[in-house]
């Protein structure tokens, strides 16, 4: 039976809102949020930005599990920007955090509706996979941003389903190649086809979620919640992450799927999505 992205999202919401499921993974408390004001903001602007990022960080951890480290937010002004958050990037060192450039003239509602913070904060749920595995990290964050926005109540599952199906449909033609998936993704990145690289890579996590639902009756989000509690602090790279996924699921599917994306023909990998 074909499992759609919508059904995956619905299952995730059930897990998040079911205490008997989520409490087992919530061994650690929510991360402490630490703000660094890199430019001048008045008190009203600070309150709005803190409300936005605190709500987003909470929804992120309700989705993927509580982070076992403090989260640092570095806030810069971008008064001339035509959107609330024109730029954001993660900080990956001894400190785990995100740098945001923001235009504080936008409303709180516009900040909460923006995808940048869910995308960037979700990156921190997994160790930095390395520059050569950017397809993996960006596919992960792009997949998670929609689920976090649903948790925040900013979009319905149906709206995210429609958006994701459209994005996946648009990027499929770029992967009609006999070259390995990661080779095609890397070529798209070099040629600045970033949306196609991001959304094509989302399929890895669609496949993971669908396999988990069919084989174990759990979602990718539930697996991530378990992962934060047991393994996030110790894992250092992509191989560590996948080994942890194998161990937590008692299954080699995560490592087998990674091998398929590393060595399988791109067109064949893409054709398997949703089956």
Where are each of the predicted segments found?
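Beta/coil-rich, acidic/histidine-enriched accessory regions frequently appended to metallopeptidases
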Residues: 5-11, 54-55, 230-275
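Boundary at the C-terminal end of the N-terminal hydrophobic targeting segment
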Residues: 22-24
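Acidic/histidine-rich, surface-exposed loop or edge segments in extracytoplasmic proteins
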Residues: 28-45
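Auxiliary, metal-adjacent structural segments of Zn-dependent hydrolase domains
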Residues: 41-94
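Zinc-dependent metallopeptidase catalytic helix centered on the HExxH motif
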Residues: 99-172
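Short glycine/serine- and small hydrophobic-enriched flexible loop segments
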Residues: 143-150, 203-213
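Structural helix-adjacent loops and short alpha-helical linkers that scaffold large soluble proteins
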Residues: 151-160, 212-220, 248-257
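Long, well-structured alpha-helical subdomains associated
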Residues: 155-211, 223, 230, 234-241
């Amino acid at each position: 039976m074909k499992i759609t992205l919508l059904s995956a999202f619905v299952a995730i919401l059930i897990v998040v809102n079911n205490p008997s499921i989520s409490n087992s993974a919530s061994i650690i408390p929510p991360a402490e949020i630490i703000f660094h004001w890199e430019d001048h903001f008045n008190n009203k602007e600070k309150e709005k930005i803190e409300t936005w990022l605190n709500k987003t960080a909470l929804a992120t951890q309700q989705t993927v599990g509580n982070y076992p480290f403090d989260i640092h937010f570095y806030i810069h002004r971008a008064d001339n920007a035509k959107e609330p958050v024109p730029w954001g990037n993660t900080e990956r060192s001894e400190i785990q955090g995100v740098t945001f450039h923001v235009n504080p003239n936008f409303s709180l509602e516009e900040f909460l509706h923006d995808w940048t913070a869910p995308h960037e904060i979700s990156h921190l749920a997994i160790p930095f996979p390395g520059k050569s595995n950017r397809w993996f990290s960006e596919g992960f964050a792009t997949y998670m941003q929609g689920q976090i926005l649903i948790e925040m109540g900013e979009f319905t599952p149906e709206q995210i389903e429609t958006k994701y199906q459209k994005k996946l449909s648009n990027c499929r033609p770029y992967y009609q190649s006999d070259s390995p998936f990661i080779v095609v993704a890397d070529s798209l990145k070099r040629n600045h086809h970033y949306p196609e690289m991001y959304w094509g890579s989302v399929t890895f996590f669609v496949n993971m979620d669908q396999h988990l639902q069919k084989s174990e009756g759990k979602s990718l989000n539930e697996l991530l919640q378990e992962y934060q509690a047991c393994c996030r602090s110790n894992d250092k790279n992509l191989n560590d992450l996948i080994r942890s996924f194998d161990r937590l699921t008692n299954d080699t599917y995560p490592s087998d799927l990674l091998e398929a994306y590393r060595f399988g023909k791109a067109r064949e990998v893409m054709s398997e999505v949703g089956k």
